Amino acid sequence: MADEHQFIENGLQRSQIDEFFADELGRAGYGGMDVAKTPMGTQIVLKAEKPGMVIGKGGKNIRKVTRELEDRFNLDDPQIDVQEVDEPDLNARIVADRLANALERGWYFRKAGHTTIDRIIESGALGAEIVLSGKVTGARSRVEKFNRGYIKHNGEPAQEIVDEGQGVAVMKLGTIGVTVKIIPPGAELPDDFEIHDDVDVEPVEQVAESDGVDSLLAEDPADIPDVGADDDVTVPQETPEEIIDEEVVEADPGVSSEDEEVVTEPVDIGGDDEDVEDIEVVSDDSGNDTETVAEEVEELDAEVEAEAEDLVAEMEDIDEEDV
């Protein structure tokens, strides 16, 4: 059997044993149990308000309960230890059964609830809550709550600190569920704190005023270290050849200046009055190239002027036709 299935089986068996003890030992003031399986057998610790009624005359009742445990739940050699409850009013299981019996005997639910919760607080409990749900009066079921002191409803404290017990009152109109929650005296809650008056507190050392910002501003600037001084900065020294990041292309010695070919591209001039800049062409024959470029520029100027005159003439002809 898998581990998780074994855990479920153990929990189911535990709840069934608890119900069995509640039915058999209800009149003795059953207050809960603890089950521990050992190599020598199954150890069961019973808590009861009246241990004598659990044991019976000459141990007759306890032997009967032991035989039924072996037959019904297949327990190996169950050993029952009966312990008396020191304060029954602080045991939620016993209080719930008492309240259920009072309701069955005809007590009014408010009187029974207030009387029970007052007895719990008088016993020293930090807080208590009683919840009655069912047909307490009339044909409709409802929930009635009685609160005193401090109670935790959720979280780890509610599981570890709060003692909870349930009981059932069988009435003519139906059943009434009884739930009792009790925080026992001396419980350590996570939000508790204490204020100690007589405590020796070490004196706090005051910081001298000279250690503040004003003292730093008042110091001589020569005494203040220069964090950003240039002495600590090292500048890498580079040669001029390393700084210049240009690629120099040497001329081919096999090609003469006469064999070099000068390529001229047409210049697009997009306006009538635009200035035409002189175009510098770098070559070995600087004198001849300059004269050639100047002649080409003059020819372009003449062509531009001629085109401008033609445009003006066309515009005048168009104006005359319109007139």
UniProtKB/Swiss-Prot annotation:
Residues 251-303 are annotated as: Disordered. It comes from the Archaea. One of its GO terms (molecular function) is structural constituent of ribosome. GO terms for cellular component: cytosolic small ribosomal subunit. GO terms for biological process: translation. InterPro entries: KH_dom, KH_dom-like_a/b, KH_dom_type_2, KH_sf_prok-type, Ribosomal_S3_C_sf, Ribosomal_uS3_arc, Ribosomal_uS3_C, Ribosomal_uS3_CS. Residues 17-86 form the KH type-2 domain. Keywords: Ribonucleoprotein, Ribosomal protein, RNA-binding, rRNA-binding. Coiled coil: none annotated. Residues 270-303 have a biased composition (Acidic residues). SUPFAM superfamilies: Prokaryotic type KH domain (KH-domain type II), Ribosomal protein S3 C-terminal domain. It holds the Pfam family KH_2. Part of the 30S ribosomal subunit. PANTHER family: 30S/40S RIBOSOMAL PROTEIN S3 (PTHR11760), SMALL RIBOSOMAL SUBUNIT PROTEIN US3 (PTHR11760:SF32). Binds the lower part of the 30S subunit head. Belongs to the universal ribosomal protein uS3 family. This is Small ribosomal subunit protein uS3. The lineage of its organism: Archaea, Methanobacteriati, Methanobacteriota, Stenosarchaea group, Halobacteria. The gene is rps3.
